[in-house]
Amino acid sequence: TLYGAEAKYLAAQLMYNAGDYAAAEKEILNFIDQSTPHAYWLARSFILLSDVYVAMDKKLDARQYLLSLQQNYHADDDIEGMIQERLEKLK
């Protein structure tokens, strides 16, 4: 469900905010594996995964996820701005 997709994202966000990056990564990867039809929350999760990887000093992985999302996500919402903001910080 849409609310379930948002809940998975928010759970991972809470783990990230608490500094539990490994748990956040696991939660996001589990959500990705579920093949959700809710593209917005999936995209937000990929962005959060890039934040997790930056925190884990895996900046190359973070950048690759962002670039892939930039190429494959085409909705007219706030995702593109989030991607650009993070890519600028990774330069």
Task: Enumerate the predicted regions with their spans.
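Acidic, polar-rich low-complexity tracts and alpha-helical solenoid repeat scaffolds
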Residues: 1-91
